[in-house]
Amino acid sequence: MERPLFSIITITFNAAGTLPATLRSVERQTFTDYEYLIVDGASTDGTVAIAQHSAAVSSVTSEPDKGLYDAMNKGLRKARGCYLVFLNAGDAFHEPDTLQKIADSIEKTDPDIVYGETALVDSERRFISMRRLQAPERLSVKSFRMGMLVCHQAFIVRREIAPEYDLRYRFSADFDWCIRCMQMAK
């Protein structure tokens, strides 16, 4: 079986209220060369049933975990795609052609990492503002001295270079993960 270009990974835990918007944003994508993995931490609020009813979802795993980053590692291990996209419950792609634009960029430059900006929106998807920390024109390991300049939702990584999240970091394992990905990138 041929590998999909993207593995979209959504982490959930009792996310019945926020998951539907995330699912809709994936279902609306015009680019469909992806697998969509839901990794759930044994929700009790109907999250799993909601995920299972989405035609876009390839796989739903629901079992206890040790928190967000443990669940993200489970998604990493299960992913088959060439690139990883973490889009957690409550997150959404900006436009229906977001994956297409990323795929076009990948086709032109064959990068290890693709990154972008993050827009903050309200529950009705109305624009609030751009994220306070903006991504630089050219991202490097040194860029992270200024903080987490790129949200992990806007940080798409070639699966082969992606390490697992370090579970010693309870709150900022994504910051550490992005730096380690940058160190592995060509």
Task: Name what the model sees in each region.
Residues 1-28:
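N-proximal low-complexity "stem/linker" segments adjacent to membrane-targeting elements
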Residues 84:
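Short aromatic/hydrophobic "clamp" motif used to bind/position activated sugar donors
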Residues 4-7, 35, 176:
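Cell-envelope/extracellular polymer assembly enzymes that use nucleotide-activated donors
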Residues 32, 40-49, 88:
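A conserved acidic beta->alpha catalytic loop
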